[in-house]
A protein has these predicted regions:
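Well-ordered beta-sheet/strand-loop patches within structured domains
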Residues: 1-341
Length: 341
């Protein structure tokens, strides 16, 4: 068993375990009941046990010390709940050891998304919109890990882009996971040695570093380049009138530019490019700036002003109209009875 304490690896001897061989045990019970068991008498059957030997030999684990890939992203603009979710997801992955041929599922490692598992409500993408959900921000964890895995050149078997663009990595460099859509980020340790995943957060930055045994040539370097193939800029604002809310209530969601992008893997030897390979292609939805605007008022004229402002499809015009209506109402409230006559 491999652990990392204060920047140094420590190896703990594994212990042999035993697991019940369910199929063989069921057969043994059936054979006893249909064979030697005498009806009405007590009896017992020994379950069939299988030996579960610990993985990893000490001499193999002792070789794990080289940085195969590392990557850092920032969540400096995130609120407290999203920041907690990023740190929590990171801690659930930190300390993972994968032996040659092992498969790692990010979703299975960080689930369930519940308060009991350390998550809180925060913003996330769902069907091209920003919504609050338990575990919002977990995709920054999977994305950061994805980029470390790419630099370690491990085998990626499943990766999905977000429905809309994210800001913490370049287009096509993201890896979304989602319970609702079944998205996962999965990779395989395709090296001949164990690898260790170190993850930590500090100063609102998350870093994953993958350690193993470096077998790649020293004069060889790997880099990744994002290419935007198509860009779709939102045009008119989308404004929804809400008759259940009073004038002055407005909820605005930011616009998202739509992209088609590709990610390229570039290999250089002695500083000279020797190969360029497409890693993935990604499509991100365009989403206009949207607003839900309250129009309810005892003053029909104020409601009419709001409806006219909404018809312009300009959130800025709507905000200006709200300010004008409030100013009119304040001025009217300040009038004396004599002035109203």
């Amino acid at each position: 068993h491999l652990t990392r304490v204060d920047g140094s690896f420590q190896i703990e001897d594994g212990q042999t375990g035993y697991v019940v061989d369910e199929n063989a045990s069921v057969t043994a019970i059936y054979d006893y009941l249909t064979g030697s068991w005498v009806k009405g008498e007590n009896g017992s059957v020994a379950l069939v046990m299988a030996v579960d030997e610990p993985k990893g030999k000490t001499e193999e684990l002792a070789k794990v010390k080289d940085v195969l890939g590392t990557f850092t992203t920032s969540y400096s603009t995130s609120g407290a709940s999203r920041s907690k979710n990023v740190a929590n997801g990171c801690s659930l992955i930190n300390g993972t050891t994968l032996y040659p041929g092992d498969t790692f599922s990010t979703y299975n490692t960080v689930k369930p998304f519940s308060t009991e598992n350390g998550y809180e409500m925060a913003g996330s993408y769902l069907n091209g919109k920003v919504v609050d959900s338990i575990g919002g921000g977990i995709c920054q964890v999977s994305t950061t890990l994805y980029n470390a895995v790419l630099r370690a050149e491990l085998e990626v078997t499943e990766r999905h882009n977000h429905s809309m663009i994210v800001t913490y990595v370049d287009p096509s460099a993201d890896a979304a996971i989602a319970e609702s859509s079944g998205k996962d980020f999965v990779f395989v340790n395709n090296t001949d040695y164990p690898i260790y995943i170190d993850g930590h957060t500090a100063d609102k930055k998350i870093t994953f570093t993958i350690y193993g045994v470096e077998t790649r040539a020293k004069n060889r370097a790997v880099d990744y380049e994002s290419e935007v193939v198509e860009k779709k800029v939102p045009e008119a604002d989308q404004i929804i009138a809400d008759a259940s809310q009073p004038i002055g209530v407005i909820s605005v969601s930011s616009a998202h530019i739509g992209y088609k992008a590709r990610l390229w893997k570039i290999v250089k030897e002695n500083g000279v490019e020797v190969s360029r390979e497409q890693v993935n292609s990604s499509n991100y939805k365009m989403s206009p700036r949207t607003a839900t605007v309250g129009i309810a008022s005892p003053d029909p004229n104020a409601t009419s002003q709001m409806q006219a402002a909404i018809a312009t499809s300009s959130i800025d015009t709507v905000k200006a109209t709200i300010s004008n209506i409030k100013a009119q109402q304040a001025a009217a409230a300040a009038l004396t009875p004599e002035q109203l006559q």
